From Swiss-Prot:
EC code(s) of this entry: 3.2.1.23
Active site per database record: 148, 307
Biotechnology remark: Has potential for lactose removal from dairy products at refrigerated temperatures.
Catalytic activity: Hydrolysis of terminal non-reducing beta-D-galactose residues in beta-D-galactosides
Its job: Catalyzes the hydrolysis of lactose to its constituent monosaccharides glucose and galactose.
InterPro entries, A to Z: Beta_galactosidase_C (IPR013739), Beta_galactosidase_Trimer (IPR013738), Class_I_gatase-like (IPR029062), Glyco_hydro_42 (IPR003476), Glyco_hydro_42_N (IPR013529), Glyco_hydro_b (IPR013780), Glycoside_hydrolase_SF (IPR017853)
Top EC class for this record: hydrolase
Thermal effects: Optimum temperature is 37 degrees Celsius for both lactose and ONPG hydrolysis. Retains 16.5% of activity for ONPG hydrolysis and 11.2% of activity for lactose hydrolysis at 4 degrees Celsius. Stable at or below 25 degrees Celsius, but loses 50% of its activity after 1 hour at 37 degrees Celsius and is inactivated after only 40 minutes at 45 degrees Celsius. Can hydrolyze 73% of lactose in milk in 30 hours at 10 degrees Celsius.
Keywords of this entry: Glycosidase, Hydrolase, Metal-binding, Zinc
Protein name: Beta-galactosidase LacZ
One Gene Ontology cellular component annotation held by this UniProt entry: beta-galactosidase complex
Gene: lacZ
């Protein structure tokens, strides 16, 4: 990470939506809340370039000057995320064609074709103008490329580029036919121009990314689209670095996470990871924690919380107000898991457009005596006090959960067994086990180094690409501990099944093979017997044959009662567990009590009293414990922290933690 010079507190500011005479007053209000940064120019292309090649930076010049004079740090957008109307009129090929084969017209955003040479040229020219103009302004601390990349395109530009991409990957049509198993349903091709993009008029149906005839085609197209958008990012970054090689460059990741963009592939090109976080009102706290751990783990460095909501959002089906104290707790949750910034959308609430009811620092009332503003000012004061200590500190984890976009795509393309396969939910089942025990956890990809961890958990590792099995075997053989589950080791990187019984190349390390998989229908409960107690399970039940593995749990109902449900296998110096069914939370907790004991993985605090507790370590080795009450019920601080200092207030830690209370403690 290119180190930020201070902890950023601020967010998206759109002064181009407001009269110039209001800007200085806005900045004065921001300063009252100890806000020190603003993200600008995200969607200003139409103002900057009203006609092709005719640029007008007069308004942006004034905005930059006023923010610089106020000593604000500026996150400068490149404005390429939403195109002006004239571009659609002059260059129709710029507009993306969606999954239903409809070419978009002017409107919304995420509306460009990533393989349009006209878009690439015009975006590049705008970025060049922008960077040449502002490259020497030292108040610009981050360049923010585009915004929340997404929106796959299925146009002729993309189809032609996809054919070239496939030719480069497979070399011959014979190689492609073999990889995609194209003898199914007379799909064999004899020329590259016979390949068509997988939209609803062809081999796919249902929600985008959910149903396909030829999984190899559909997965490769998602890889291609993610790479195409990444190439746009790389193009803009190259231009920025030519004129400003020092200032860090990012683009904001988003979603739960965004399924269509492989952030692990993108991470190497980011100087710093940034993320937009908008948990729904009913999302459990561990879900947001997982996403923050994923963002931190992409580069194993602190990240930017680029966007979040002071209170309500405008686009979710239901958006209750954040309760008193809840905003501070949710912002500090991001910091606890690795964020070095707290930034909002938006700093000033719009009067029009679809986001006019999205909460802001300056609300429509334009008052500073409101509940939300007072809470924002209190948060600003605490970040001003604690930010210098927190900035740059890191998380050290000995547990890793494997999350992989190719598995995300292929797992949810599975046609058969059950329609209820959900990759993220399956991962969260296992993340929750460590979250509730306050065990620091990294979220890693299949290409990351496993040897850094005492325990690696790879739920639903459906796709095992070439070489991954050897990597897992070597890790376990050398003393590592590995957990995998049902729907693992089933297919190769083209989504073709491994023969010889499941879990395919993972049979050796797990010491089992799976004969069949039963779907558990809605409303049905299957019992699993473990340590003399029955536990409910669902979704899928693997019928397991142990080879070398010992049995930890058996099914207690259905015709496969008495057969293994969970196994443990000694392999070299390490062990591998196989969980053949989706145990409900109580049963999974019982199982992980055993696994965690056996592996020696330690919790930060044993008597957590239902508090979320994480730890960051500063460069000089000081430990910072983030203690968060992510509920509206009163909790008790663990006795371990008696006498610690709360760096948010400078006072001693307090024992009774009211709802949404936060303490950041050091000894």
């Amino acid at each position: 990470m290119t180190q930020l010079s201070r902890f950023l507190y601020g967010g998206d500011y759109n002064p181009d939506q407001w009269p110039e005479e209001t800007w200085s007053k806005d900045i004065h209000v921001f300063k009252k809340a100890d806000i020190n940064s603003a993200t600008i120019n995200i969607f200003s292309w139409a103002l900057l370039e009203p006609r092709e090649g005719k640029y007008n930076f007069s308004k942006l010049d004034k905005v930059v000057q006023q923010l610089s004079d106020a000593n604000f740090d500026i996150v400068m957008g490149t404005a390429t995320a939403a195109m002006p109307a004239w571009m659609f009129k002059k260059y129709p090929d710029i507009a993306r064609v969606d999954y239903q084969d409809r070419r978009h017209v002017f409107g919304q955003r995420h509306n460009f074709c990533p393989n349009s040479s006209n878009y690439q040229r015009l975006a590049g020219e705008l970025v060049k103008q922008l960077v040449e103009r502002y490259k020497d302004n030292k108040h610009i601390v981050v360049w923010h490329i585009n915004n929340e990349y997404g929106g796959n395109c299925y146009c002729e530009n993309c189809q032609n580029a996809f054919r070239k991409w496939l030719k480069n990957k497979y070399k011959t049509v014979e190689g492609l036919n073999k990889a995609w198993n194209m003898n199914v349903w007379s799909h064999t091709i004899y020329d590259w121009d016979e390949i068509v993009v997988p939209n609803e008029l062809g081999d796919v149906w249902g929600i985008e990314g959910s149903e396909t005839i030829v999984a190899g085609l559909s997965i490769d197209y998602l890889r291609f689209q993610s790479e195409s958008m990444q190439n746009l990012f790389k193009m803009e970054k190259k231009i920025i670095k030519k004129y400003d090689p020092e200032t860090p460059v990012t683009t904001n990741f988003h979603g739960l996470p965004n399924k269509m963009v492989d952030y692990q592939k993108w991470a190497k090109g980011q100087d710093i990871i940034s993320y937009d976080s908008y948990p729904t009102y009913d999302a459990p706290a561990y879900k947001a924690a997982f996403l923050y751990d994923l963002m931190r783990s992409l580069k194993h460095q602190p990240f930017m919380l680029m966007e979040s909501a002071p209170s309500q959002v405008n686009w979710q089906p239901y958006s209750p107000l954040k309760r008193p104290g809840q905003m501070e707790a949710t912002e500090f949750q991001a910091v606890a898991h690795g964020a070095d910034t707290v930034q909002f959308f938006q700093l000033k609430q719009a009067v029009g457009g679809s986001e006019k009811f999205h909460s802001a620092v300056i609300a429509h009332s334009q008052r500073t005596d409101t509940r939300v503003f007072k809470e924002l000012a209190d948060l600003g004061k605490k970040l001003k006090n604690a930010g210098p200590t927190i900035l740059g500190s890191k998380t050290k984890a000995k547990v890793a959960i494997v999350f992989d976009w190719s598995n995300f795509w292929s797992y949810e393309y599975v046609d058969g067994i059950t329609q209820d396969l959900n990759y993220v939910d399956s991962i969260l089942d296992y993340y929750r086990q460590f979250y509730e025990r306050n065990i620091p956890t990294d979220i890693i990809g299949v290409d990351d180094d496993f040897s850094n961890y005492d325990l690696v958990v790879a739920p639903v590792l459906y796709m095992v690409k070439h070489g991954l099995d050897k990597k897992i075997n070597d890790y376990v053989e050398n003393g590592g501990n590995f957990v995998t589950t049902y729907m693992s080791g089933m297919v190769n990187s083209s989504d073709n099944v491994y023969l010889g019984g499941y879990p395919g190349p993972l049979k050796e390390v797990t010491g089992i093979w799976v004969e069949e998989s039963d779907a558990v229908v809605p409303g049905q409960k299957i019992k699993v017997l473990m340590n003399g107690k029955d536990y409910d399970t669902g979704l899928i039940c693997n019928l397991i044959h142990p080879n070398d593995a010992k049995i930890l749990a058996t099914y207690a109902s259905e015709f496969y009662a008495g057969t293994p449900a969970v196994t443990e296998n000694q392999y070299g110096k390490g062990r591998a567990w196989y969980i053949g069914t989706r145990l409900e939370h109580q049963g999974l907790t019982q199982l992980f009590n055993h696994i965690i004991f056996e592996t020696g993985v330690e919790s930060l605090v044993c008597d957590s009293h239902k508090l979320e507790i994480t730890k960051r370590v500063t460069e000089d080795g000081k430990e910072l414990y983030f203690v968060l009450n992510m509920s509206n019920e009163e909790r008790t601080l663990p006795s371990k922290f008696t006498g610690y200092e709360d760096i948010l207030t400078g006072e001693k830690a307090h024992k009774d933690m009211k709802g949404w209370d936060v303490q950041v403690l050091r000894n």
